[in-house]
Amino acid sequence: MSVIDVVPMTRAHIDALMPFEREMFGAEAWSADGYRAELADTRHRYYLAAVDENESLLGWAGVRVVGDTAEILTVGVVPQARRQGIGGRLLAMLLDEATRRGAVEAFLEVRVDNTAAQQLYEQARFVRVGIRRGYYAEGRVDAVVMRRAI
């Protein structure tokens, strides 16, 4: 495995992540403008990018912290870099930052059919607390709501 660095995500990462964002999240994919707006709100939001020694994007993740609650907004790992611990590393670093910002609990939503992501979150001690019916895919796919104390 190559050396993987995790760095604060910047606008420079957006162009590299957009093809993967569209491939992985389909109709729920965020736009480049959406990412730019997210990165501009540093008071409540924090984003990371995982890159290799050539600065190629391998993954990205973001969290929003308001008061004592964190919401994991996105975690993505490019297909060729999956199963190398990148998603777990990004998630752990987001939770560390959320704690630093005063959060005591974290929530997220994940597609009910995304079992790989659910396993990642369960390994990070998230537990299922509910279902949001019709949350994804224009109302055709439910979301599992997960929570953990941090």
What are the residue ranges of the model-derived segments?
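Structural motif
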Residues: 101, 119, 123-124
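Residue-level recognition of the GNAT/N-acetyltransferase active site
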Residues: 78, 82, 111-113, 138
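Short glycine/proline-centered loop/turn elements that form peptide/ligand docking sites
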Residues: 91, 113-117, 134-139
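Conserved GNAT acetyl-CoA-binding A-motif
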Residues: 98-109, 132
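Acetyl-CoA-dependent GNAT
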Residues: 8-84, 91-97, 101, 149-150
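Short hydrophobic/aromatic beta-strand or adjacent loop that forms the aromatic wall/cage
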Residues: 44-45, 141-145
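Conserved catalytic-core motifs of GNAT/GCN5-like acyltransferases
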Residues: 109, 122, 127-143
